[in-house]
Amino acid sequence: MTLVNEHFLKLPGSYLFSDIAKKVNTFKITHPKQDIIRLGIGDVTQPLPKACIEAMHKAVEELASKDTFRGYGPEQGYDFLIEAIIKNDFIPRGIHFSASEIFVSDGAKSDTGNIGDILRHDNSVGVTDPIYPVYIDSNVMCGRAGVLEEETGKWSNVTYMPCTSENNFIPEIPDKRIDIVYLCYPNNPTGTTLTKPELKKWVDYALANDTLILFDAAYEAYIQDENVPHSIYEIKGAKKCAIEFRSFSKTAGFTGVRCGYTVVPKELTAATLEGDRIPLNRLWNAASAPSSTVLLTLPNGLQKPFTVQKAKYRLKKQSTII
């Protein structure tokens, strides 16, 4: 008899963003003349830059020729993209990685969901509240979240760290040890950020408590303040306690293309029950996306188009949200 993973049965009957989409569609039907400002899924509204489209056409033509056809890509992603990521995203900020610490994938969402597969099911979990649903759902599906408390809508084995107007939407450092802490900055859904001193407190906490920080930096492209770090690795010691997730959805408008990457430093370890330290880098892998070739164009003359594109989003935001 084949048995199901009964933890899946604990999930609520519907997904938050699916519910939002249904309500939006219903509203559009009943109010056809209303202009809707969507504050749900962080989708893009501008087309892909011309250079990306040209690169896509070139990549397709390569697949059509016997001389240039590519099959399965390298398990960590193509070297040309990994080298470009290191050169453009990290070296300018004084951060240095080897190519084997960067894992190209089909997006930050899948990686933040799948990363739990290399961690024991009985690790304790901490999340900011409110939180991106994937962080919770992925822990529910592996049995790490515990039992859903109907009255509160919260899970028994998850520590929720409130982000409210009372604390300026900045969570307080926990007063107890937690095995895994999810941080997303700039934050989804509040839009808040952490300064370097504020993020340093979390790194210090993680180092002192042997805590793993899962840092979602999907929205780093929108940071404008010099005192707000684009990467957790701008903080000393973070390579020993943090995994960082990046997305090209906001940098390159790739929500419909799917490509991102995860950084797993070689210095980062976790323990076995016997107390042996195991490098997490060697446990992780990547799903090399076909969109990788397109991203080679990003560092080559595309800074201006992407700067203009981000400026359009900011102007749109300022003109429609009061």
List PLM regions with ranges:
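Conserved core of the PLP fold type I
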Residues: 61-206, 220-236, 243
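The start of beta-strands in P-loop NTPase/AAA+ ATPase cores
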Residues: 35, 95, 179, 211-212
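N-terminal small-domain helix-loop-helix segment of the aminotransferase-like
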Residues: 2-106, 308
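Walker B catalytic acidic pair
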Residues: 217
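Hydrophobic/aromatic beta-strand patches that form the interior of the parallel beta-sheet core
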Residues: 37-39, 126, 159-161, 214, ...
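Conserved core segment of the aminotransferase class I/II
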Residues: 151, 234-320
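Residue-level marker for buried hydrophobic side chains located in beta-strands
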Residues: 185, 213-214
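Helix C-cap/helix->beta junction micro-motif
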Residues: 31, 208-209
